[in-house]
C-alpha cells in the first residue's frame, strides 16, 4: 500500500527531524510467492507503479521539515535507472566496488548510492570463509542475486562452490585497515554511503557485532 508507506515515512521523518531514509525493494519471487503467498509481478513495472502512487499519495498531518528521501534496492541496470528516474537513489546489496562504479554511471552524480558491504573482522582465513559462507547460503539460491553476480563476471561454479575469489570479492575480511581499504574502494567508485553488515564469526546474527561497528565507525 503506497499510501500507507507515504504516511508512515512522512511521520517518521517528522519525528526524527529528517534522519529517516526510506528503502523500498521488490524482493524475490521464491520469497514473495513461496513464503508470502502473493503473486510476484514484473519487478520494474511494479516498482515504477508503486513509486508513482507513493509520490502522489496525500499526507495531511504535521509535515516534516523536508520530504524523506527514498532509495530503491537495485542491482541490475534497469532497476538502477528506475531508481534514478523515480527515487532519490539506490541501495545495492551483496555487490562489489566494480558494481558501485557501474551503478554510479547509471544513477548520475547527484543521486544517493548507499551500498552494502559485508565484513568479517578477523585475519584468520578459515574463520572468515566459514562466516562468509554461512551468510551467503540463504542468498545463493535467489535468482536476482545470482544474475547480479553473473553480470559481474562470476561463474555458476563460483557461486555454487563459494570459491575463494567469489568470497574475497564480496566480503571484506581481515584487519581493520584491510576492511577500511574495501570501504574506500566503494567510495572512490562513487558510493555516497557504505552500509556495513558485520558477519558474526559463529553465524549468530541475533547478537550485534558491536566490536566491528565500533572499530569501523567514522
Question: Where are these predicted regions, by residue range?
Answer:
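Active-site-adjacent structural elements that line small-molecule/cofactor binding pockets in enzymes
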Residues: 1-218
